[in-house]
């Protein structure tokens, strides 16, 4: 039996360097990178790098050997090799100016087919939905790009078309759940087939080309190439699940025969689809306003009343109400407000929306429509206003969706200072800093106690002073009444202003002394009985006086430190780095929470000081105005 040599088995055979993989696949570095992106193969970090690299201490990019062996049987490898042959032959035809042969070769340009890769990477439809977050975020980003050197116009147009189709599905299925405005863009969360999908829609700013190539658009374009195929498959499956025609089409009532439609029907339809303001054509004739919930309520009713089942029932009822949150409301979007995010949100929850026809095609009613209930404005003032509608800022739409109810509009009027815009994508049970407004949302009892105004504090102090004065007055009245009773008793005891005879006085005194002796004897007997009763009760129940226990904070802190040191000593040597990392993360979180609390405290104190100074100035101004008026009246 041959003795195995070193690095012929074990970890050394499980990994392969990138250079060896390129030699094995006979591909260039760019083609290898493209193949790895399309197939989902990525570099690996070995447990023992020196063993994996066969004794070499140089840091190399390593892949699993089985992944490279898996790439050997990929049909795309032959297409990538055909690209080299095509480039050589087309270059030769250009050099000799054989344009006839060049035209023939361009017609036979080798195309990469990615259908089998999508099916291979996502065996089930749920797997594709789980990996849809990055896909949507990247495609929404590329849909805003103009034609660049490494991003062709056709790719940007395809990204725009696929994302609009997905938004139409979200509107038709009413699957939107959470929304949020951030510096990066608009965050959305939809629940499709039980999977929560999050994506970001960037803000609509003019594109600014970068002088330095900090972003590798070529690599991103390869990701987009795969994600477009994936989202196309997903949209097809989603549309057929709702009985919608794919590609999206309009009913015949929308396409009216006029000059605009007869000139170019395809561009008219594409513009109306991009408007997101029309219902799509269904393959069945039944128009279902609301999709039935995925949870079987009858099955839940058969189970016991456990907390989990009750919570599922409550969530199902909340989602049913949420789908019709804006039902019966008509919105009008002003020119300065971003149109597309608000149209998605309003239509996803049953509302109707329109805008100025000069901004974008697809508006359904004008600003002068009297049935409009809300107009969304993002400017300090308006020249003309209608009494029949509320003029609100765009944040009202987002906050209503996140709190799943229609909020009062008085805090969102034109020119009003908006309340804090809280993110719905945070965990309420987390250990980090939670703003007071968010705590008040989860616990309504905190609303009254949080951030009391100066008026309330002044009223409370005045009420406390009144109560103290009333208590003092009651004590004084009680003392006066007691003194008056004692004086009247003495007055009756020793006679009054009308004098009496001495004999009568002596007889009265004797009688009085006798009565007092009898009463004293009775009182002594009663006291003896009470004392015996108290002794019996004490024998039954013994109570000792409590002692105040003062906590020594220094000793408590020392005990915690000793416990932490003991815990650190008990950690195994191989887990010490992980333990230190966890401790550092905990300390950084505590420090961040402390800084945020301090910052919020400073903000609250500054706001209170500003309110006090404003009230003081207002009082001074009122007093000065009153004095001036009095002087004028005297003259």
From Swiss-Prot:
Residues 321-414 form the BRCT domain. Residues 529-540 have a biased composition (Basic and acidic residues). Residues 596-628 form a coiled coil. Keywords: Coiled coil, Nucleus, Phosphoprotein, Ribosome biogenesis, rRNA processing. It is found in: Nucleus, Nucleolus; Nucleus, Nucleoplasm. Belongs to the pescadillo family. Required for maturation of ribosomal RNAs and formation of the large ribosomal subunit. This is Pescadillo homolog.
